Design a protein with these regions (language model features):
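Acyl-group handling in specialized metabolite and lipid biosynthesis
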Residues: 90-103
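Donor/substrate-binding cores of folate-linked one-carbon enzymes
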Residues: 1-88, 95
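An anion-binding loop in the catalytic cleft
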Residues: 101-193
C-alpha cells in the first residue's frame, strides 16, 4: 500500500515480509492512476533495500512487458485505487543512521538492512564512527549496546541481539567485523553506540 519510489526501502525498514511492483495508468496525480497489474514478492529476512531494489527492477521490466501484452489482448480491467488505504512514506535521510541498540534486535536489523546501500546505519566504537553494512539476528541476550561476543561480533539489543557482519570505519573501506577486530581493541562487556 505504500506509495512513491522509496517504498522498497521503507518496506525493509518496517520489517515487511512482502512487497511488489505495480503497473498503473498515468494520470494527473502522483501514483494515483488505475492499477493494471500487480506482482508480489517476499522480502528475505537478511535482504537489504539495495538487493530488493535490484530484484524489483527486474520484476518491473518483466511486468511492463506482461502488462503491455495483456492490454493488447484486452485481458486487463483497470482497478481504481482506494486512496483511503494509501500510506505515504517519510523521507529517508542521514538523520535515520544512528543505531539505537535499546530497540529490539529485529528493529536494529531492519534499520541496517533498510539503510543499505544509502545512507548506511552507523554506530560508534571506542568513540569512532562506524558504518554498519550488514547484520544477522541472534538469540543471545544482554544489556543493550554491550558486546556479548567478539567471535563473531554480537551486540545486545533491547530484546535479543544482532551480529554485526560488515562494518566500515570512518575513512576506511568496508570490511568484515572479524577483519576489523584483528586491528582494533574490543572486548566482551564493552559498550558501543
Amino acid at each position: 500500500q505504500r506509495q512513491m519510489c522509496i517504498r522498497d526501502r521503507q518496506s525493509v525498514l518496517n520489517g515487511d515480509r512482502e512487497t511488489g511492483v505495480t503497473a498503473m495508468q498515468m494520470d494527473v496525480g502522483l501514483d494515483t492512476g488505475d492499477i493494471l497489474k500487480v506482482v508480489k514478492t517476499e522480502i528475505g529476512v537478511n535482504e537489504t533495500s539495495g538487493e530488493l531494489f535490484d530484484r524489483l527492477s527486474l520484476m518491473g521490466g518483466e511486468l511492463i512487458l506482461d502488462t503491455l501484452s495483456a492490454l493488447e489482448k484486452g485481458e486487463i480491467t483497470p482497478i481504481k485505487q482506494d486512496e483511503s488505504l494509501a500510506t505515504h512514506t517519510s523521507k529517508i535521510d542521514k538523520s535515520l543512521c544512528p543505531i539505537d541498540f535499546t530497540k529490539p534486535s529485529f528493529e536494529v536489523h531492519n534499520k541496517i538492512r533498510g539503510l543499505n546501500p544509502w545512507p548506511i546505519a552507523t554506530t560508534e566504537i571506542n568513540g569512532k564512527k562506524i558504518k554498519v553494512h550488514s547484520s544477522l539476528l541472534c538469540e543471545k541476550s544482554g544489556k543493550a549496546g554491550t558486546v556479548i561476543s567478539t567471535k563473531p561480533l554480537i551486540v545486545a539489543c533491547g530484546e535479543k541481539s544482532v551480529e554485526l557482519c560488515e562494518i566500515q570505519p570512518e575513512g576506511k573501506k568496508k570490511m568484515t567485523a572479524e577483519a576489523f577486530l584483528a586491528g582494533h581493541r574490543l572486548s566482551v562487556g564493552d559498550v558501543i553506540g
